[in-house]
Amino acid sequence: MGKIHRPRKGSLAFSPRKRAKSIVPRIRSWPKETEVRMLGFAGYKAGMTHILMIDDEPGLTNGKEIFMPVTIIETPPLRVFGIRAYRQGYLGLETAGEVIVPDFELDNYTPSKKGKGRKFTFYQFLGRRIATLPKDYTQEEFEQKLGALEDMIKEGEIVEVRALVSTQPWVIKLKKKPEVMEYAIGGTSVEEKFNYIKEKLGKEIRVGEVLKEGELLDVIAVTKGKGTQGPVKRWGIKLRAHKDSKGRRKVGSIGPWHPARVMWTVPMAGQMGFHHRTELNKRLIAIGENGKLVIDGNEIEITPKGGFPHYGIVRGDFMMIAGSVPGAIKRIIRVRPAIRPPKKKPPVQRPQITYVSVESKQ
């Protein structure tokens, strides 16, 4: 008789399979880098297309033209609006303080006909996400708080500083409410990380300033929601026999007589999708500007004929990432440099692209 080998259906590693707390994904771990840069970026998923490229990774197809499905993520510039400092606590890092920039007039928002002639400030949009923004917050108060934070760093009380950033979806005419998140900074000392954020406070950061074409990224997002699904779709259990009694898309047994209870490991119906997921080592194929990709000196519009379904036109900067990424169209997608890269890494440069499909995806 052959070896009986039947692993259980579905992974228990992601249990409980419940909805994510927030549609904005969290990054709990950061790679350690000596280069002083922001460790990641964020954008909005536009859709997928495919390209032909010369394979530059070691293997059988090296130097040959290969087909590659790619995901387009539109990345309007992020606005650095604050700095958060951490001290070492008994159970880990503790917030020691934070400083945000005072309000200022926006120069990248194009109002509708009703809003023509009006001035719009950054706090008007940030206030849609953060309800506790300070009122009558002056430049002097800002500089005073920043100086106090700098003194804490010199005294050695601070062990980590991170940048508070806001997305600017109004730049690409997607929506007005921004997403707010925190990004770690690469570097060897707290002082150089602090100086990097201090220089960027109140300014925009574009994706090309942070990430390099060809490098490996980890993609963090909330997956598409599927609602309540049965055990066959949710866990991948086997369909029961044709003449089985009392249902076909059910588990045959929910457990033994004893222990006299239903174990948590039994595949059951329930929530599927809208889960927080991280996918490792996705290659950043290319970075484009103004919705265009430059190939051999020629500008190619990345938007397919008729626009990306349910998204429309890519107007600003964008990332082209190899393969698929989790999340629905228009959903916020976060990336960071690969925290667990393979030993054989592809070269950190854009591969030679010979063709980009802009045929209709309708």
Swiss-Prot record:
Entry-linked InterPro entries: L3_arc_euk, Ribosomal_L3_dom_3_arc_sf, Ribosomal_uL3, Ribosomal_uL3_arc, Ribosomal_uL3_CS, Transl_B-barrel_sf
Organism (species): Pyrococcus horikoshii (strain ATCC 700860 / DSM 12428 / JCM 9974 / NBRC 100139 / OT-3)
Region Disordered: start-end pairs: 340-362
Function: One of the primary rRNA binding proteins, it binds directly near the 3'-end of the 23S rRNA, where it nucleates assembly of the 50S subunit.
A GO term from the CC aspect: cytosolic large ribosomal subunit
Subunit structure: Part of the 50S ribosomal subunit. Forms a cluster with proteins L14 and L24e.
Keywords assigned by UniProt, alphabetized: Ribonucleoprotein, Ribosomal protein, RNA-binding, rRNA-binding
Keyword hit for rRNA-binding: yes
Bias (Polar residues) ranges: 351-362
Protein family according to the UniProt entry: Belongs to the universal ribosomal protein uL3 family.
Protein name as it appears in the record: Large ribosomal subunit protein uL3
Pfam families: Ribosomal_L3
Keyword Mitochondrion: no
Gene Ontology process terms (BP): translation
GO terms of molecular function: rRNA binding; structural constituent of ribosome
